[in-house]
From Swiss-Prot:
Its main location: cytoplasm. It comes from Chlamydia trachomatis serovar D (strain ATCC VR-885 / DSM 19411 / UW-3/Cx). Keywords: Aminopeptidase, Cytoplasm, Hydrolase, Manganese, Metal-binding, Protease. This is Probable cytosol aminopeptidase. Its cofactor is Mn(2+).
Amino acid sequence: MVLLYSQASWDKRSKADALVLPFWMKNSKAQEAAVVDEDYKLVYQNALSNFSGKKGETAFLFGNDHTKEQKIVLLGLGKSEEVSGTTVLEAYAQATTVLRKAKCKTVNILLPTISQLRFSVEEFLTNLAAGVLSLNYNYPTYHKVDTSLPFLEKVTVMGIVSKVGDKIFRKEESLFEGVYLTRDLVNTNADEVTPEKLAAVAKDLAGEFASLDVKILDRKAILKEKMGLLAAVAKGAAVEPRFIVLDYQGKPKSKDRTVLIGKGVTFDSGGLDLKPGKAMITMKEDMAGAATVLGIFSALASLELPINVTGIIPATENAIGSAAYKMGDVYVGMTGLSVEIGSTDAEGRLILADAISYALKYCNPTRIIDFATLTGAMVVSLGESVAGFFANNDVLARDLAEASSETGEALWRMPLVEKYDQALHSDIADMKNIGSNRAGSITAALFLQRFLEDNPVAWAHLDIAGTAYHEKEELPYPKYATGFGVRCLIHYMEKFLSK
């Protein structure tokens, strides 16, 4: 996929379907953010009476016989002194939506004068590219006649030398191949994206990139490893579970290793603690954590980062049936810790627990980061724009927060309240899998933390229940699967671990 190109000269630009022109907002009025020919000013000067240049505002105009592009989009970037990376990201995502609805395929984008901004040309271009790439996406549909919007096919960014721009654009395109993989997996029918399908995708990645190795455990191997919690959740499903291990060796001589774990519940009915229909209808997205890990590995291998990373995906359906695991029963995890089942709809933490135990036994991790659409309580707490995360290590938490801020993928650190751990008490087992009806996200994280046992490994848990899937478009993401987390984690690993 090569979509974005850079061109230093305005005069030498190629003909295109559309031109995007940037504007600041000053005193509630639009102010030109770049110098253009008088022919273009004649096109847009009358439109400025109804266009203020505020963040993300657009105006769609038609050119004339003297303009090289016949469609012109005015794009507001807000006050120049307040522009941030997120402003740029969301503005160019909005412009991409407008351009695609106008059925444009080739686009010229004129950069604003960046020297007066608080951040670098590189940061501006990175966020511009991310905005365009994020909304140049179609989720899978099943119409008899395809009604999807056409893609942008060539976007030329003017005002930057190719040596600088093209390097940034190639990197972002590689990164978004991972984002698109994550989105496609989450958006596709649950009957298609089974545990076996996730395993097949992991195998395909290992076949594509020599730096990746893959190991797949079937039900028999899962039982042999004594992963009783994953096996319990899988009991009621007609589809077979899989335990997927991906390994990336980007720095073989280093002992530093990051383990990424993704919850892979390919459909969650709630089990015998059956979800109501309205809550179940989107549950094909309950494997978004697994899809995020696969997307990260796609980008990681493509970018050839000099780090060592292991990805672990416990994958199963949580189905209702006569063989399904039961509330009130006790099941034993990989290390011998026993769990009384208070709800079969709290299954994600069970399979993550066995994955954490596996990582500690076999991977010698420096840090563990897990991704899971784990609790509705997190959606109540932070909504759909911010993912909550928990961490037992302040350095890891600080670095994740910084990567979040710099990519626009919002994370907010939540507290591991030690007092709440007592809510997991069981009279007949080492713990229950649910607490009381309060602080549900915190008690879920505390449950996972118990499976670290006495290991001092740095650990973070990202609850992406609200951010992984949106039922309406919310910039800079399209409708449905967002691919949230891929960009943030790649940036985190590149900035803080690739040394």
